[in-house]
């Protein structure tokens, strides 16, 4: 990715929080799967009226994660450092956030209420994106939004799993998919 593309890729707020039906709603409860350095969580907390936000990220290497990330130089030390940066970045919102340091599939019992939104930016392999959508869609409140990052079709092969999983879910359930790169979302 060239420098200009990388800068555009990291611009906040992202389309998800700018264009979905979340703007103007009060006391939102949501979740972000795949927090990384906390940049997007910070943008969500700054942009939207969020009462509570579950931040879900294991910050640990696991077999399927390693397959996709080792070529980026990601190792356990990098993940631990990223977690420290995320926690520092989000300190001002500590009364609004609940950290869940687990895989998203293991985090489900920790969520005790309906969610107004779920933002998925975890493992980009098709099976994991499918699992996240299937697991978290039923937790959405009426009018809730599920969406995520990296909906790139064709020109970034490492994100093909996102496109396949999202498209399959939308077609299978007769839903309307909204896309503004790099984000996608579906309103319940």
Please state what every model-predicted region is.
Residues 2, 17-188:
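S-adenosylmethionine/decaboxylated-SAM
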Residues 1-14:
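Conserved SAM-binding loop and adjacent beta-strand
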